[in-house]
Amino acid sequence: MLFRFGFVANAMCLWDASPAKTLTYARYTKLSRSERKDALLSVTKANLTNTLRTIHYVVGHGIPLYRFSSSIVPLATHPDVLWDFVTPFRQEFCEIGGLVRKYDLRTSFHPNQFTLFTSPKQEITANAVKDMAYHYDMLDAMGIANRSVINIHVGGAYGDKQSALGRFRVNLKELPDVIKQRMTLENDDKTYTSEETLSVCEQEGIPFVFDYHHFYANPTDDADLDDILPRMIKTWQRIGLKPKVHLSSPKSESAIRSHADYVDANFILPVLERFRQWDTDIDFMIEAKEKDRALLRLVEELSAIRGVKRLAGGVLKWKA
């Protein structure tokens, strides 16, 4: 049974390598027409260059999972900008995708919490569709849309969860099927529990990303891990990818929803051990603040457990 690990966006061990450099709309509007285009191109070029640097880094360190930054392209979905970011950077996107395919990396995106399908406002749904399309277009430009996923949360409850869930199913029909096929859902830390999110996934045929920290912060009343985990595993069978779990640990007892800089191995061990009964390879995305540093420290700590063997920088063969 293999446990594989990855991290989010920015490799902390690389110098000045943020793939999420920004160009605010306020700054954009103060520029001349030619300066605006140059600024868009310059920031996007820097973010793609740093994304490529990070991909080389994960390959070199034997880290098989990576989540792209959602902020690679500035102002990509702003209604007053909406620019063609693929054509001028087709070579860069292709180079990134080529490395992903060559080294069989598992990649993903995670749009922010405002990309949701439970809102009663049509413009919110329209913006969600636009944002999902932006992420899909980047994957498509890389040539990896058929092997990557775009992960979001169910959304808000708006005072009535059942009505909101009904709207989710209706509003989701606005999303092109080719994008929905690459979509996953994750339980959140305040509103929709693991059981509620998993139920939506089962009904809609969407893979379920289980966040163990969120499960702890927003527990399910009528289900436990022995019920949730095998059902979660089953939701991934349709797209042929390994089940995926998000890992982080609370910053403190008084801030249980906040992510700590590193992952407390003792906090996550119960869920790692629970997977042994299903003998299934699992992919884990580390969501700690120290990103790759947290991943490497955690894998080092776990590899010291009797019966666990480290196969690569981010890969463990778990004890039988």
From Swiss-Prot:
- Alphabetical keyword list: DNA damage, DNA excision, DNA repair, Endonuclease, Hydrolase, Nuclease
* UniProt KW Protease keyword: no
Molecular functions (GO terms):
endonuclease activity
Q: What is its EC number?
A: 3.-.-.-
Q: Which domain of life is it from?
A: Bacteria
Does Hydrolase count among this protein's keywords?
A: yes
Share an example GO biological-process annotation for this protein: response to UV
Q: Which InterPro entries match?
A: UvdE (IPR004601), UvdE_bac (IPR023520), Xyl_isomerase-like_sf (IPR036237)
**What task does this protein carry out?**
Component in a DNA repair pathway. Removal of UV LIGHT damaged nucleotides. Recognizes pyrimidine dimers and cleave a phosphodiester bond immediately 5' to the lesion.
Q: Which family does it belong to?
A: Belongs to the uve1/UvsE family.
Q: What is this protein called?
A: UV DNA damage endonuclease
User: Which lineage ranks, top first, belong to the organism behind this chain?
Assistant: Bacteria, Bacillati, Bacillota, Bacilli, Bacillales
